[in-house]
Structure formats: structure tokens, C-alpha cells
């Protein structure tokens, strides 16, 4: 969980970013946000144009067109991530302190029900469209809880080889999850609800954020030792490593621009271009703000949203909350 937030938005033109040899990025606009408490993962709901922020004891909804706070969903304890099930217009929010998942209505911004999970500290959370299940990655018990979205009940528990972090689905029956304490990547078969492969990510250390290119079958793990590890999703072969900023916590891939993003605690956003399935190059390290480690990609606008805190003493009152829009000058 991060510190109270300053919200940043970075906007990138699809064509300009993909083809510019030396792109020049800058912060373009600022929005006030406000509010107290830490945060974790960010999620874009493209249907409502909402940025959903896991904000410690509540979900904050920010209008991605105006940058204004439009609502909050309270009554939570220590939330981490939000998985969207668009067909049902529901969100599933992992609550690490309550060992549960809160089901929210994405249109009314209300809590519908709570689902206790069979693990401790549910953190990363992902929807797998192939099975219709939501999976929570339980950081303190080393397992994944499987929730059937038709019944909103836990239907299986999957033993994992270590402490799970972020997870992604390929939409074809597999979920991939970084194993932070082992420097590994695990593959879950969502038909059998079992891990069917585990791959070593060395020289990557402490992988956190994870993204996927479902077309080229490439996985992007961002690591604490300033590396992005690129892995073949079918064979587990390491395709490449790419230098990124320090202290990453999230990764995103934009299929329209072929860009991979790493948001880093050192106040940079590393942008990597996928030239082809086996070749990758850094095109920019965009200054953001120290602490801006988590992000969301808006696929409609190709904008990147991040959050960070205004500098201040530990436990000091929150102030100077601002949304920043950045892109090519």
C-alpha cells in the first residue's frame, strides 16, 4: 500500500509514440484530487470512463475526461486491486485486511456483497474470461482463491510456489503470476485450477508488475533490480531483458502502439517499444514524480494514469493532490 496520493495522467498519441525516433514527453496538465489514505493498484473502466483507485478503505472513481472525483465506495479495510467483469458490470476488489473480496456495481458505485476467500492477504486480482472466474493472489498464504462469478462463491484454491504478486490472463485458459520471493513466473491452467509450469526469471529479482501481449505471446515482468524480463508465454523461454527505472510496481502493454510501460518509484515511467516478438528498445524515461509506482492504461485514449504523494513528513496530513496529464510535446 502506498502513501496518500497525488494523481498523475500521462497521455500519448498512438502513432507518434510508436514511430518517433526520439519522442519528447512532458507533463501537459494538472488536476486537483484530494482525499486521505494510501493506495495500491489502479484500474480503468472504459465503459464509464472511470479511473478506479484502490484507496486503502474505499474505491475512488475519477472521471478520465475531466480528472474530477465522481464518487467513492466506502466500507473496506485495506484494499489492493480491482478486477472488472464487463459483461456483468461488476468489479471485484481484493481486501487484504479482511481476507475477502468486495463485489461492486460499476454503474451505481455501490457494494453488492462480500466474498470471504480461503487465503490470507488477497492482493493481486484478475478476471479470466475463458473460465468466467476471478482469481485472487493471496500474498500471506501462497495460494490463489478462485471465485465463480456466476455464484460469487469460492470454488477452488490453487497452491502457488511462493508469494504471488500481479497476475494477468491470456484469455485462452491460462493465468500468469509473478512469484516475488522466488524470482519466478507461474502459469495456472484455469480449466484444472492447477499450476502447470513455473519459470525462473533470473536475473530478475523480486518481480512485481506484470503485463501481457496476447498476440505475440509475450509476458513483461518488472523487477526490483531495474530490469524488465520478457518471457515467452508458451515455452517459458526468456526472450530479453530491458533496463527500466528503480522500484517498479506496475507494468502495462498497449497493443495499439506496441508499447510496454513500467511505472517506477524513482519518479520515472519507462516506455519500451516492441519492435517484434524478440526485439525491444527503450524509447523514453519520462519524469513523473517520486513514488508514482502504480498505473493504469486507458486503451481508448492511450493515456497512462499514475498516483503519487506530495512530499512531506511521515504521517503528515495530506495536501497538494494533483492530477497531471503528460504526453509528446
Label each residue range with its predicted role.
Residues 1-2:
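N-terminal secretory signal peptides that target proteins for export/translocation
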Residues 5-16:
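Bacterial N-terminal signal peptides
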Residues 17-329:
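Predominantly soluble domains enriched in secretory-pathway, periplasmic, or organellar proteins
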